Amino acid sequence: LHLLSRRQRQMCIRDSPIGVFLVLYLGLGILFEYVMEIPMGFDNVPIVVAFLAAILTACLQNPKLHFDQKLEVMAQGVGDKNIITMLLIFLAAGSFVGIVGRSSAESVAYCMLSLIPARFSVAVLFVVACFVSVAMGTSVGTITLLVPIAAAVSKASGFDLPFCIGSVMGGAMFGDNLSFISDTTIAACNGQGCKMKDKFRENFGIAMPAAVATLIVILILSFQTTIKGHVSQPYNLIQVIPYVLVLIGGVVGINVFLVLLIGIGSGALIMLIGGYVEPVEMLVRMGNGVSGMFETCMVAILVAAMCALIREYGGFEALLGIIRKAFKGRRGGQFGMGLLVGAMDIATANNTVAIVMANPIAKEMAAEYGITPKKAASILDTFSCIFQGVIPYGAQMLVAISAVNELGSQISAFQVMPRLYYPMFLLISSLIAIVGVKGRRRRYRK
């Protein structure tokens, strides 16, 4: 801070609510996970409480504004069209995933494993994880479903267990980055004000080369392994139809609400007519799916309120000033945006929260450096995916390790990390995409 002017130092102090949140969340997470050795310690940190403390800090600042005025500023921030849209999409996506359940994803995996030779089992796991996560919109959900299958493949075929787990995690992050119903996509697109299909096309050119490179590496390593056997389980592909409809609808550019309604309607009909669930159980599943999004919605609301106050105080100007000094031109602006969301993700271990927190700063950076909304949304989603995919204390890694341990095997995050090929290739692909940007810095105009 000593390198900044007095005015910039004052503005940095106005950014302190973000610092309060990071200290509380990261500090408690490290305490729970590594000192007290509580399993999945970061998930035990009350993130909503940490954000409430940050908002309280923001409310105590700037005595020139009365408390009622601060409430009005926060209400205007929460009532923003993009925030409301994001919340509604979160809830609709939760309802869709709740209806279809885990059986559809398992059917895709077992179908492909039964059709393709055992030597290609790990490659199949990666491709299935890509498809399932794009369809479901959740990397953690995909990992939860496919890690037991990956463990079974490892045991039956002789493939290295970290190799199988790392391939599933890589595929899960591919879909989390591209899916139309992923909370990261929803947060990035609504925060930057771009259409999901535009962000998808922007991301696709970065993610697909990384996925192809990952698949090639997996195939090369697969041919160096001695195969012992294969996995065979029953499956039902009819239950996959809702996922396919949602995927097609998103790619062709149908409104995301309409796409989700189609998915919810088709999923409900298939599950009821096929006799897979009773009507009451269907409603319970929908409720559980929506409930699973409540914390994400609360975080979005609290971050919107906190950032509205910080913006009102002029706090973001200091961060932008630091970024302007460190990064020059459009390429520099994109690097800065990627590092910003990456730092937020390292601190919070949650890529959705990282994007929501970075959104307001990134939007001002986009205007400053002449970065289009779809490019800004793509950078936020991609770099948060890269960092989230490799940190050893992220939900994805912790869920994978926990699932393997429950199955009676022992594995550590540091055994899996060298096998996370997709995030590594995604970083390379992202850097190439940024370095390839042409043109001088210019302010973006809608």
Feature-to-residue mapping (PLM):
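Alpha-helical transmembrane segments of multi-pass membrane proteins
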Residues: 89, 119-132, 158-175, 332-345, ...
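Juxtamembrane and boundary regions of transmembrane helices in multi-pass small-molecule transporters
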Residues: 170-173, 177-233, 238, 389-390, ...
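Hydrophobic mid-bilayer segments of alpha-helices in multi-pass membrane transport proteins
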Residues: 14-26, 41-63, 86-92, 149, ...
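Interfacial loop-to-helix junctions that mark the boundaries of transmembrane helices
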Residues: 33-48, 76-81, 112-117, 201, ...
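Core transmembrane alpha-helical segments of multi-pass membrane transporters/permeases
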Residues: 44-61, 70-104, 119, 123, ...
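Membrane-interfacial loop-to-helix junctions in multi-pass transporters
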Residues: 45, 80-86, 110-127, 154-164, ...
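Hydrophobic alpha-helical transmembrane segments of multi-pass integral membrane proteins
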Residues: 86-97, 117-149, 324-363, 368-369, ...
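Single conserved hydrophobic/aromatic residue that forms the stacking wall/gate
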Residues: 1-9, 13
